[in-house]
Structure formats: structure tokens, C-alpha cells
């Protein structure tokens, strides 16, 4: 039986978020709705989840000693990683000493780099993936490109949001793709994955939640990417019954192998009735922001229910819905948003402004959400709303 204590009391149920961006903010809000005490952690002050949490701390989560000390100080009931850049060896060590890591410390370790999860999916579970090679040096990388052929995709094994990712379409791209991958990795360079290009019709995120009563799936989410980062997402993504069955089989296999309770964002490529596994995140997914508008339980509510050992009786999808990203580009610590009256003038629309404290370069600062009669109408409406928001730096 799940028992939730009172925040800021000796009987509190404490959740520590490792990573406090816009996804962590929504997790914090859902956790607080269910009476949990939330401690938000990130590498910079004023991160979105810190703005709503009971307490916050600023540390490098890759600093094993600092992370170990903070967990010992706060004594959380649950540690919930919201990003990949974490000293996962500390989580594995403390999990063996009874700390609850969501979904598991092993899942956090395997998914923090593309090599761990690709080897699990392709080599251990036998899931269909694109042909791939790993390379540590430029010579190994060039051999991998030669073996796989062009076009191929090059990514750092440790990166997110499309950083360091590019497509090699001709021999002229080979050197630049290596250099770009070295600059985009979280560890400052090193190992890359080279993948054959999959000629897919579309790609989806299949949100999969492991909870006390089993495994549940959300309706598939389609999305459009630019420079490796999502710009619009929509739900439901139309797909054949055969493809959906394969997608759910793959999602169940990989999430079962990772174990634990929580929501997973499983990324898949689809061509006709054929499905390829791409990646998985053991946490809410940015493309899943659309579920705030499209479902009775958003991906964040589902994640928190699963973490706390609460049931998920049903996931209701309300019909065509979409999200569209609000981007800022430049340099500022005084970002403001205008023209909101016009942006929110259409029925069945809403905005999330994340509250990120500064912009350096290009940064996702919010998202527009919309419902429509069709997916196409919902996407168009969400884009109109996001385009109407004036970002002032």
C-alpha cells in the first residue's frame, strides 16, 4: 500500500529531481499535486523546476563526490533522473544500499550513452535497428563510414537534443561530421556511433509506462525535428495496426529489460508496416509535452503515479492535438514574452513558458499546445500560437 507523507514534516515523501529543466518542472508540479516534497537539483541556479520545488541545490551531477554528499544530506525516498549527464556509478552504488532510483540505476547508466542502449536493444534483445558501428578514433570512424556506406548518420555516443548529430551524404561531409560530433558530445569529444540511414516514412515516440498494475501505452506521437531537436509534435500519429503492434512489442521488450517503474519515451522509425528501434529515454520525453493537452493523464502525471506506486487505470486520449516549440536565439538574461493576447486568442489553445533564466545561442523557451478536428489542423493552430509569441531578449 502506498502511503504519502506531508511535505516539510518528519513523515514527508521526498523526491529528488536530478535535472530541473522544463520536463522536470512538470514532474515537480505533478508530484506536489500528490503531496510529495520535491528537491530540485541542476548545474545552474533558477532552473525551471527549481522555481516550483520546495528546495533546490546547484551542483555538477557528474561530480560523484558532490552527488553522493547531497543524496546523503537530503535522504530522498526517490531519486528521479531527468537528464543523462549524471554520475550513474554513484546511483548504482547507492541503489545497492537501498536507495530507490527511477526507474533503475542500470537504466540511467545504459541510456546515458547510445552504445549501452543500442547494444541492449540490438544484441541482447534482438530488436530491429539500423546497421551501426562504434568508433573511438577518426580512423575507426572513416572505416565505419566506408563499411556502412552513405548516407549515414553520425552522433556522439553521449549527447542530447541533436547536439553533434549530422548526416554524411557524400565524401565531402566526412571530415566535418567527425569534427561536429567531437564538439557536440557531453564529454567533450570521443566515441561516436555511425548508423546507416533509415529511409523511414515517419518517426514516433511511444510513451510507455511501467506501473504497479503492468505496462500501459499512450497513443503514438509523431514529430518533426530540425537540427536533431524537436519543433512540433502531434498525437495520435496515424499508423497501421501491424506497425503499432510491432512498436508496442519493441517498447515492452526494452522497457522490461530496463526494469523499474516509471514512464519511458521509446523512439522508433516506421516505414509501412516495418518498425526500427532508435532510442529510449527512461523519463518523460520532450515530444510528449503535447500530452498536457491531449490526455487525461499527461506523461508527467503518469511518471509520478508510477514512481509512487499508484495505479494507472486508463489513459484517455482526447483526439487530435499538437505542440509547437517557442524558440529564442541570441544572448540575454532578461527574456520577456509579448503579444500573448493574440497568441491565446484561438479556442482550445494554451501556452507553457518554461521560465529559463537566460538564453545563450538558440534555446527552447516554451511550447504552444492546441486541439483540432484533425492532426493537421491541430499542428497548424499550435504553430500559429507559437509564431504569435514575441520573444524579447
From Swiss-Prot:
Pfam families: ATP-grasp (PF02222), PurT_C (PF21244), RS_preATP-grasp-like (PF22660). Keywords: ATP-binding, Ligase, Magnesium, Metal-binding, Nucleotide-binding, Purine biosynthesis. This is Formate-dependent phosphoribosylglycinamide formyltransferase. N(1)-(5-phospho-beta-D-ribosyl)glycinamide binds at residues 22-23, 82, 286, 356, 363-364. It comes from Oleidesulfovibrio alaskensis (strain ATCC BAA-1058 / DSM 17464 / G20) (Desulfovibrio alaskensis). PROSITE patterns: ATP_GRASP (PS50975). GO terms for biological process: 'de novo' IMP biosynthetic process. The gene is purT. Mg(2+) binds at residues 267, 279. Belongs to the PurK/PurT family. ATP binds at residues 114, 155, 160-165, 195-198, 203.
